[in-house]
Amino acid sequence: MIDCFHIVQRLCEGLEEMRLRFKQLAVTESRKEAAAFAQNEDRKAKQRAYYRKKHPRNKKERRGRKRIRKQKYKPTLLANGETKVEMLTRSRNMLAQSGDKWGDSKKERARILFEQYPQMKEAYSLICKVRAIFKSHITRKEAKEKLHEWYKEVNACTLREIKAARNAIKGKEEYVLNYFLNRSTNAAAESLNSKIKGFRAQLHGIADISFFLYRVCTIFG
């Protein structure tokens, strides 16, 4: 059996790949803007120097205005006061959550993010539909029908990260659908595995496997 947590986690990994891809593009765009701004400032500085050389100032005359200096580059800010790179960086945890858990600032960030990147909105919407399927108290047969409808929606999109996640789910579909038989999860087994790993780390390795298993059964049995 594969529970809903791992399914949603796999889809969120696909969304995370998209976020990182768009972030890298935003970083490249920001660097190009900064370089173009610096180049423009250098050009204006050379023009001012050339003008001062051709029109030397009379020291007896009062300066009419303050001397112009090079301006510092200021990146373009979005409506919430963040740059594109900052918005994409701070969206990591937000995109892994359900929309009903967002606060006001996250809702505003999500609105701007989805306006700037419609593909991420489409991917997040597809993930929310899978969440809704697993939250529904339906039979295994009904879940299979809904899951196949979701496959068709993914087929219609052009998001390669979500399609890769869809293929992974499709390959384990029978195990995924077993979740709807009694809605049980692997939480207990994963908790026990975590405890055993922690216990093994405290021992700094295992010299006698039989004695280690005996101690595990005694402590966690």
Where in this protein do the model-derived segments appear?
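Acidic/histidine-rich catalytic cores and adjacent linkers
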Residues: 28-221
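Conserved beta-strand -> loop -> alpha-helix junction used to position metal-binding or nucleic-acid-contacting
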Residues: 1-36, 190
